[in-house]
Amino acid sequence: MSALLQLNQIFKVFNEGTPDEKIALDHIDLKMKKGDFVTVIGSNGAGKSTLMSIISGKIITDIGDVMIDGKDVTYIKEHQRAKLIGRVFQDPMAGTAPKMTIEENLAIAYSRVKTRGLSSGLSKKRRDFFKEKLEMLHLGLENRLQAKAGLLSGGERQALSLLMATFTEPKILLLDEHTAALDPSRAELVTKLTKQIVNEYKLTTLMVTHNMQQALDLGNRLIMMDKGQIIFEANEEKKKSLTIEKLLEEFQLIRGEKMNSDKSVLI
C-alpha cells in the first residue's frame, strides 16, 4: 500500500548562522499508510511540534519533501492544506473562535473544506448535521448551538475542536498534545473521544503526546524523537509488547543517557 503521508529528508534549522542556531529537524523520513495512527513522544526541543507544523504548512522545510496522497505539498500554504489536514492544538483556546457561537464555529470549519459560505453552513439541513455530530460528544452541546464558544469549559472547547477538525474526515489528523492542558477527567474524556472518532472514520492520525502511557494505549505505531531525529520506531506488533519501562530502556540504549521517570523524556 502506498503512503498517504510521506516525509523525505526533512531538515529545518532556526536562527541559522547565529549563536542561537538550532537544528529542529535533522533529515527526518516518515511514511504513514491510510488508517495509520502514529503516536509521537520525545523531550522538549525534540522537534515534535516543528514536525507537525511542517506537515500542516505553518512552517516550510529548508530541505526535503512533504507528500500527501501522492501530491507534493511542500510549498503549499497552510490555508490551502486545510482541506487535507485537521489539527487540534494543546491550547483549548486555539481551535475555536470564542466570540462566535458553537454553530458558527462548526459552520466555518465545514466551509473550509466544502468551500461554501457561512450562510449555507447555517441552513436547517446543516444545523441538523451539526447536532448529530455534537451528540457524539455526550456533552449536551447539541442543545447549546447558540452558546458562545468562549463560555465553554476547556474540556468542552477541546472536544469541540476535535469534532471541528474531524467531521469533514480530513486525509490527515494532527493532534499536538491536545489533552495536555486539561484536568485528568477531561483529558480522559477527550482521549476516549479521540479513539472513538479516529476508529469510526479510520482517520490517518499523527499524535504528539507528553504522556507515555497514552502513547502506548492509542494507535498502531509509535515513534520516539530526540534532538530533531526519530531515534526509535515500533510497529503494531512491537508496540503491543512495550511498556514505559521498556521505552526508557530503549532511550538509554540509544542515547546512553538514563531517564529517571517517564516524564523526563517528555518534558
Language model region names:
Residues 165-166:
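ABC ATPase C-loop
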Residues 72-86, 94, 116-119, 123, ...:
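ABC ATPase NBD coupling module
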Residues 64-72, 232-234:
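Conserved ABC transporter NBD signature motif
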Residues 209-210:
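H-loop/switch region of ABC-family ATPase nucleotide-binding domains
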Residues 3-4, 13-27, 77:
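A short, flexible loop at the N-terminus of ABC-type nucleotide-binding domains that lies
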